[in-house]
Amino acid sequence: MLSVCIITKNEEHNLARCLKSFQNTGFELVVVDTGSTDQTKKIAAEYTENIYDFPWCDDFSAAKNFAVSKATNPYVMVIDSDEYLQQIDRVQLEKMIAEHPGEVGRIRRINIISGKDGKQENKEWINRIFAKESFHYTGRIHEQVTACDEKEYRTYEAPVVIGHTGYDLPKKEKKAKALRNIRLLEQELKNSGWDAEAHATQLDQNIAKQDTDAEQKSKITDAKKEQQIPYLLYQLGKSYYMAEDYNEACFWFAHGLSYDLEPKLEYVIDMVETYGYA
């Protein structure tokens, strides 16, 4: 019923832990390598025969969609190399998948971060389980699960808990990762056509006239196109925050929070909190 899909590159220090944690679940393991030069592929071969190469193209969604396409089961759970399974109720999970075929399963992720007071944990729910024929990934970086028909979808909380150490890096590595993310995010924002100056001007305008039906429809269309923009702005702010460039972080957070956002969304809550810290 379920395949676990993983994209990886030079993760010899993390991949064995990841794959070993799923070894006894009975799930198919699919590993896609995007250009490792270390022992990553050799380690993967100890746990699965389903290893594929994908030329890196600065697009995480493209790589993950390729991995999903290689799964032989109708449902997939997408996992990162620096994540590992902590808890799972397989019987309950399969029951929930069967009861929610057109929905996306959210799993509990525990982010482990080193702080001044030692190891700290941050918990969140993330969309990771879905039918491969109905959903795919969009977004060059910090990719999101999107319905193939582009409609909104419902989610359910799956009985799966994973650990994540991707944020628990030495200062130099953490900054390098943040700078890589910034480059990809700025490219994606550029491709979307968003412009900071134009956005600020639009916010300052006070349109007094009554919109025509055509203008209202146009605004609805534009709003749908811009749904991903605040999330990109949040991710840019977060990446600059991780790189310890707090002025830039505040700049992007301010633009992100200028949109009419649902305050209960996890990324909105985190954006407000991190903006305050910055």
Where are the model-predicted features located?
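Cell-envelope/extracellular polymer assembly enzymes that use nucleotide-activated donors
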Residues: 1-3, 28
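Short, well-formed alpha-helical segments that are part of the catalytic scaffolds
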Residues: 6-25
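Acidic helix N-cap motif at the loop->helix transition within catalytic regions
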Residues: 13-16, 38-47, 88
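A conserved acidic beta->alpha catalytic loop
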Residues: 21, 33-42, 56, 80-84
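Conserved donor nucleotide-binding strand/loop of the catalytic core
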Residues: 27, 41-66, 70
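Catalytic-site signature of metal-activated, phosphate-bearing donor transferases
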Residues: 62-68, 79, 85-251, 255
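Short aromatic/hydrophobic "clamp" motif used to bind/position activated sugar donors
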Residues: 76
